[in-house]
Amino acid sequence: MAVVTLAELLEAGVHFGHQSRRWNPKMFPYIYAERNGIHIIDLVQTAQLLTQACDFVRTASEQGKSFLFVGTKRQAAAVVAQEAERCGAYYVNQRWLGGILTNWFTIRTRVERLKDLENKEESGYLDQLPKKETAILRRELEKLRKNLDGIKTMKRLPDLVVVVDQKRESTAVQECRKLGIPIVSILDTNCNPELADIPIPANDDAIRSIKLILGKIADSISEGNNGKVSSDQEDTQELQTVQ
């Protein structure tokens, strides 16, 4: 059974692609038509692939798998954080630091630094330091929060990654492919569907489009885990060295 109707997709503007001159020919099978120089996405396929993606993440969630949402563009940032938190997924919504996945142990030291500074802030320790030192540490804290807050509780690599705007998040996609982590990706008409395990052809610029699709995926993850946080957030097992 489809998780979304064509009417919902139309209302959210999911069918609007990029200018036809910016297209990736590999998206041809998912394009319905061209109107005034704009590619129109085939929403029948969008609905089918979104349903497939939701079934996939629901099953993974039932198995206790962990998820990472990635979307750093302005239109996606707030929605990515909101929907990830709602279903117990991790997220990166400001800046993808190279090596978050392929060099996780190094990134994890920065996560530990973030936790340390937050503990010092909560305890009042920072306020006891000289003003100049306090200002430096608070700037460091805010920078770490901005980039790492969504993966602060992540103790090992995610089992599945959900990407908004494949072209913008190309580094994240490359890292996933290198490590063999499955990718569910919202793809506009300028993207390459071959780089996603489950491509979802859709407008990746409109907030309503992003929210509709991520919302359906988050709903399915929540259904799979019955509203529980994914098991690895409580997993203290150390990750084996990433080759």
UniProtKB/Swiss-Prot annotation:
InterPro entries: Ribosomal_uS2 (IPR001865), Ribosomal_uS2_bac/mit/plastid (IPR005706), Ribosomal_uS2_CS (IPR018130), Ribosomal_uS2_flav_dom_sf (IPR023591)
Recorded GO CC terms: chloroplast; cytosolic small ribosomal subunit
GO annotation terms (biological process): translation
One GO MF term attached to the UniProt entry: structural constituent of ribosome
Keyword terms of this UniProt record: Chloroplast, Plastid, Ribonucleoprotein, Ribosomal protein
Spans annotated as Disordered: 224-243
Subcellular location: Plastid, Chloroplast
Family as reported in the entry's similarity comment: Belongs to the universal ribosomal protein uS2 family.
Name the UniProt record assigns to this protein: Small ribosomal subunit protein uS2c
Gene: rps2
